[in-house]
Amino acid sequence: MASLEVDQKYLGKLAKTVEADNPLLASILFKILGLSINLSAHTVKARKQRRLEHTSRPNQSLELYLHIIWLAREGALLLEQYVIPMVGLYVELKVLAYKLRASFYHIFVQFHNHPPVTKWDLSTPETQATATVPGLAPQRIDKGKGIAKDDDLDPVPSSEGGPVGPPPGFGPESPAAFLMPAVDYLPHAHNYFKEAVAIADQLLWGSHSLRLSVKTEYAAFLYECVHDAEASRTVAKNTIGEVYDATEGIDNDMFNDACTLVAILGKMMKRGLGSNNTAEATGTDNGAAPPGMI
């Protein structure tokens, strides 16, 4: 969560900075800050809850997942419609806006991608098996033998027919499809991260908090969503090198941010490596984020 904490700190600071000249932009930034704080708490809860469950037991917290996707959707819309078109004159805000857009799409990839690429995705078969619309009774799972029927319901005679399943080749629709289309968000998210990295490299020095925030989340994205452990470790390693090579002066606050994020990047350099520093299965997702990340 350290990367998010840096983003939230700059959101508040930059919103106050532009408030006098552009009150509309400031109000939108404060709204995004509120969304980001709520989204951070929800994603942490979802990840912890998923890790606590047995691997064979699907996550049943549909409302939590729907809220996560809704918050990310609203944040992305505010950025694309109001913030990004107005950030041309603000260096730090431009980097932050493009980074946050990538972050919101990172959420879509984690929780609402089709096909699923993480264990937290709503559209995984296990999650869909127990996903229910709030207010309706959930289906009961008969210990892996199929969906159990209520004992007090009479079976439907075959002559009268019954519920019609989807045609062959068409699986059940994602429970969150009414919020966001169930499509592959991975290419879009990857391109947005590349764009944010390029802008950060162009406008900010190597030890700047926002540049480190961009690189830290990009490394996490490469590992847990793209499943490219080697690329993730390379980004982490190169970013640490850029910090040590930077000659620009920084204040105490930025120094503390740099120390925290470099420590996280140091751990990310070792993700996917065995005890003898040999690569394990590429990009294996064990359901846990690196320390300091959601």
Please place each PLM-identified region on the residue numbering.
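N-terminal alpha-helical interaction modules that lie
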Residues: 1-191, 195, 257, 264-294
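Extended serine/threonine-enriched, polar tracts that run as long, contiguous segments within proteins
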Residues: 180, 184, 188-235
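Histidine/cysteine- and/or acidic
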Residues: 145, 244-261
